[in-house]
Every structure is written in structure tokens, then in C-alpha cells.
């Protein structure tokens, strides 16, 4: 895959255009402030009763309702939760889009699964920073940026790709590198990673390790330290230098034990289940299940949240984290 940098992007494709950022959460505040400080004309679209209105105004941003922001804008970036985008698109975005406008996203879920089907007269693009919003913002203020993905779903004006690259540049992304992909590939890999590794797989691995030690008679505190707390040390090594950096940094005992016992935990059967999970993402079964869950009032999700919050690892973890003065309590 090719990477694009500063010389490959031209902010001129966004200059003189009105840009609306819908949402002012983690990504929304970073997009709005970075683009504004890159010299672009930005407003934020929010519900009138949103708690984010005051924060956005205090940051020097113009704030409108979603409908007003879209009507004013040439380019609209939708940074709202996936489950709310369809309804807001149908009631407040679509009626106010004009031919030649650009509709932008930071994640492809609603476009890829046809929850949102824009008119062919508008550009549809994606700019997806591969970092949380606070890091997108912080690196920009330091004169750097984070890697970004871009994609084009519809090019009505012939400038969609150039606009996506320019947006990434406005965020600071071209200083790190921008990779072009598709809505399909971004969406499917993102969902799979969350489910099988980042949020689903890792959480279940942690709980299983904790339970194994506790059921064998070891104190919950030690089980927490070994299976939850110390994971950050290892993940930081992965983050900085991959698997090799981790293996180089740990003891020979840990390296040998991990290499010989790890495959007994993540067996071919686990990988086979991962493939099933990927298939559910690819064929839309997961998307339908999630949409039905949202429409049904989150009954299953709320039950699962309650079960997880009541797990023993959460109770002992809360006590142990109180001992860690360096942690910011939330």
C-alpha cells in the first residue's frame, strides 16, 4: 500500500470551502481545532442541548445545529456514534445536502452496510486517523501528526481524493503518512480487530487467566497484577517495536515460556473461531445484529455490561488502582 506525505496533499482543495464537523467528542474536537488552525473555515454541528456546545464555543469555534451546519457547509464530516448516524442523516443531513457537496466519515460502517446511501451527486470520502482524538490533537500542536487512512466511495466532482488528502494534511496526518484504502477494507478490519483481539479477545483472555489463578487458590490481587496490570507493560513494547521488541525486552524465562505455551492457549481452534467472526463481519450478520440490538433498546448489551462490571477482576482491580498514585482517577 502506498503512503502519501506533505508534498502529495494540497490544502487548496479545502480553502475557501465551508466545513462542518458533526459531533465534538474525541475525534470531533481534534478535527475541528486542527482544521481551524490549518486556516480552514470550520463550524461544529451539535444538538442545541448538547453539553459540548459550551466547550466548542470556548475553543473559539462557531456552533450551529446539525441542520444549519449542513446547510451552510460544502463539506460535512460525520463524527457521530455509528448507531445514531442513519437517523440523523435522514432527518437533518440529507435534506440539506446540495449537489457537489462532500460527505465525509472517519469510519465506514454506515456506508459499507448501506445504512446511509448518499445521492450520487455528492462526494463520499473517509479520513480515519489511527489514534484517539486526544493524540490527533496533541501531535498536531507539537508540529507532528498521526498516520491516517483515506478512502473514496463516490467521486461526484472529480476532486474527492484530493479533498481527502487535503483533510488528512489539515489534521497533520501527512507528516506521519497517509494510506489509501477502501470503505470495505477499513470497516471489516476495524470491526474484526475490535471483536477478536482488541476489545473482545483480550478481555476474555484476561478474565480466563485471572479465573484460572484464582480457582487454583492464588490471591485475587496477584492474579490481577499478573493478568491485567502488567499487560500494559507488554502492550507498550508491542506498540513501540512489535513482537521482536517485546521478546528482546523480557527475560529469557518469559520469552521461552511465552513462545512454547502461547500456542497452547491460542490454538488452531481459536483461529478457526476468528475466521467465523470475520465471516460474520464480511457478510453483514454482525452489522444486522448490532443494529437490531440498538433498535431493541440495548437489552443484551446492558446485560453483558452488568455481568462484566460485577466480575471479581473489576472489584479487586478498583481497590488496587487506588494504590497507584500515578493513575488519573475517572
Swiss-Prot record:
Name of the gene encoding the protein in the UniProt record: ilvC
Cofactor comment: Binds 2 magnesium ions per subunit.
Name of protein: Ketol-acid reductoisomerase (NADP(+))
Protein family: Belongs to the ketol-acid reductoisomerase family.
Gene3D superfamilies per record: 6.10.240.10, NAD(P)-binding Rossmann-like Domain (3.40.50.720)
Leading EC class: oxidoreductase
Molecular functions (GO terms): ketol-acid reductoisomerase activity; magnesium ion binding; NADP binding
Active-site residues per Swiss-Prot or TrEMBL entry: 107
Amino acid at each position: 500500500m502506498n503512503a502519501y506525505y506533505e508534498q502529495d496533499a494540497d490544502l487548496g482543495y479545502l480553502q475557501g470551502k465551508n466545513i462542518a464537523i458533526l459531533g465534538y467528542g474525541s475525534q470531533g474536537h481534534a478535527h475541528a481545532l486542527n482544521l481551524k488552525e490549518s486556516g480552514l473555515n470550520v463550524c461544529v454541528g451539535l444538538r442545541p442541548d448538547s453539553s459540548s456546545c459550551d466547550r466548542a464555543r470556548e475553543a473559539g469555534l462557531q456552533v450551529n445545529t446539525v441542520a444549519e451546519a449542513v446547510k451552510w457547509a460544502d463539506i460535512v464530516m460525520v463524527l457521530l456514534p455509528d448507531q445514531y448516524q442513519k437517523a440523523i442523516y435522514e432527518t437533518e443531513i440529507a435534506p440539506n445536502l446540495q449537489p457537489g457537496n462532500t460527505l465525509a466519515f472517519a469510519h465506514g460502517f454506515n456506508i459499507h452496510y448501506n445504512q446511509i446511501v448518499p445521492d450520487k451527486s455528492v462526494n463520499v470520502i473517509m479520513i480515519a486517523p489511527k489514534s484517539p482524538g486526544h493524540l490527533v490533537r496533541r501531535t498536531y500542536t507539537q508540529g507532528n501528526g498521526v498516520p491516517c487512512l483515506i478512502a473514496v466511495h463516490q467521486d461526484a466532482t472529480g476532486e474527492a481524493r484530493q479533498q481527502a488528502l487535503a483533510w488528512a494534511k489539515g489534521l497533520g496526518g501527512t507528516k506521519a503518512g497517509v494510506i489509501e484504502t477502501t470503505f470495505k477494507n477499513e470497516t471489516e478490519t476495524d470491526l474484526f480487530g475490535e471483536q477478536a483481539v482488541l476489545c473482545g479477545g483480550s478481555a476474555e483472555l484476561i478474565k480466563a487467566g485471572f479465573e484460572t489463578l484464582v480457582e487454583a487458590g492464588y490471591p485475587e490481587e496477584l492474579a490481577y497484577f499478573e493478568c491485567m496490570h502488567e499487560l500494559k507493560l507488554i502492550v507498550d513494547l508491542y506498540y513501540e517495536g512489535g513482537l521482536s521488541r517485546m521478546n528482546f525486552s523480557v527475560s529469557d524465562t518469559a520469552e521461552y515460556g511465552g513462545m512454547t505455551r502461547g500456542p497452547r492457549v491460542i490454538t488452531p481452534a481459536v483461529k478457526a473461531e476468528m475466521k467465523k467472526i470475520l465471516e460474520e463481519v464480511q457478510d453483514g450478520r454482525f452489522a444486522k445484529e448490532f443494529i437490531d440490538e440498538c433498535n431493541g433498546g440495548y437489552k443484551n448489551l446492558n446485560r453483558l455490561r452488568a455481568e462484566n462490571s460485577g466480575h471479581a477482576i473489576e472489584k479487586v482491580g478498583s481497590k488496587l488502582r487506588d494504590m497507584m498514585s500515578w493513575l488519573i482517577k475517572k
